[in-house]
């Protein structure tokens, strides 16, 4: 239930209260939510919720119901309840409530079987979000650090695709083990187009999670390869922290968050190779026939892409301007109208659930203008809209009719260290003004992408455009 509806309920209660006792036998009994609702196994008035965490709830009594605001998500049987309302149809509902890291108050509207309502306010304090910037930074530091102690430094650098590269193979095995350890059916997909098995055209890590509906498929991914030595525009990199170790680690954290959830469609979480060589990794997955490739007999509904993460709002540049934040849905066939339903999810997540500043601008112009709406938002911090912008693996799936979201941090003139030896974790920290600032920036974009996926999964209007 949104805040306006909650306020309406409260207003009604205040208006009715002075009339109590005036109607004799018609007087209704008082509502006691604690008789039917528990949060974390205690009465609501004794509960304390934490930001960014799941909390168990129990709702008893046929016909009783609860509803929540947009930034308090309801899950039943591991599945998101999109209308934010659940009613007891039998005896008891067991579920979970998920706050965001930015939830400042928890208001639950309780309604009994007779239609009487009561507003329940639950205190909230700082928590450890299920996906968080600190975990992201720790894993980034482990992957990109090189030392003699393998418990402290993974040393998964030099992940160049193309010629035989033991460093890339070693990193792929590490990533595969992460997904397998979380219970995903995980495969390494090698595709060889030129006859030399020692030089695969692509080598992807594909993790599968079965959905309830066997007729559809959806996915999320980011590329794990980095720009090779001599690559344009900056001469290549050995660490590739921004492009795209950052997106790779976000996928590892999403896998952990999704492990106990139930999705409608079969779901793939992927780490692509050969993105820097022309999207060859995602194309190999989408266009080849194998047991763990993209199924050709199922409807591909949507795909979300993570590429170059962290250098974005709420982080600030050294000149005092916020870094631009880019998130584009697509395809955008007609710039004058909304073309795809996933755009509504994109907008709702950023501005209704996560409460990002829609109209924040800078004096002047940002330095990158590659999308078809650039003239409309050259100075807008939250560049969140429908667009055809490409340059990454979402294009592979958009070309197959899927609705897509592409998350991308600052690029070109706004942050030009990618594809260069300067693309390091230390440089990212320095550019945003500190580790905490980088963690906060990553936490926001990871929550945006995670919620987009969860909500899109339960949005039937999101269909393949060729269906």
Regions found by a protein language model. Give the residues of each.
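A non-catalytic alpha/beta surface segment that caps or lines the substrate-entry region
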Residues: 85, 145, 149-210
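Metal-dependent peptidase/peptidase-like ectodomains
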Residues: 272-404
